[in-house]
Amino acid sequence: SRGLGDVYKRQDPNNIPEDSPVAIANISDQRMTIVTTDPTKRYYYTLVFNDKYRVKIATRNVNIPGIQNFRDMGGYPSYPTKKRVRWGMLYRSAQIDSLECYSRRELKNIGIKTIIDLRSESELRGHTPLQQGFNVIHVPIKTGDMEDILKGIQEQKIKSDTVYRMVERMNRELVMNYHKEYRQIFDILLNSTNYPVVIHCSSGKGRTGIASALILASLGVNSDIIMEDYRLSNDYFNIPSASSYAYNLPARSQEAITTIYSAREDFLNAAKEEIERRYGDVDTYLQRAIGLTKEEIKKLQSILLVKND
């Protein structure tokens, strides 16, 4: 392709004036470098090609010290609506507990208002809660098996292939046993005053992965893109830092721990197959199991989707 690409940036994804570009490059270069001087600020960019075609982009991962796997769920296309998920509205992450002041400032800088914590009461014990200033809503989804699995791995009683089957079973149970909890999450998201929202559990992979998949599905994002989003946890969750004790375990046990913290396609597919077996498809599940009306789904889409530029 020939021509020029202009880049404009702003902290507000809904208001990026095209007055003074921060960078201009030949489209044929297929790349450009933009240096930001303040790492605590998050920027969104509009790329304008030949003064005609526009696309809004941002980094998906948000680097906040003390929080793993923190990422923006914006930008994904919703083909049925011909729209995209809004940037800067909906985030997902691993556990959020007490943070240093600069990390809290970064959360404030991206505007986080509501934090949905999916961890169980037993998981919260021993963790110092996040300081005041955020609306933290607990929607506990218990994965009792997880603690037993980790204990079994440490005692070298459970192997990697056994863990694989257990996580698949756990994901099937997640979509069948927690309809009320998912309904509560959707109720929070249906209130436009709660945004921006971040959803998290312990690793930001299992329960958060299922919840995020259901939300994206309700917005009309297709299954391939939902899987792509799910698998990003493999890039942004640091397993060694979450399981430092594993260094003292034999290789087989380390492999089992890697399995339990990984976002494998089979794990999300297990949940999807269970939904399809019981309800036929995800849309029917959202309506019959979770109780979302078509009007509520349209309302959620009006909040979280935006027209393509």
Segments predicted by a language model, with ranges:
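Cys-dependent protein tyrosine phosphatase-like superfamily
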Residues: 1-2, 6-198, 211-309
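Ser/Thr-glycine-rich phosphate-binding loops at phosphate-binding pockets of nucleotides
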Residues: 203, 207-208
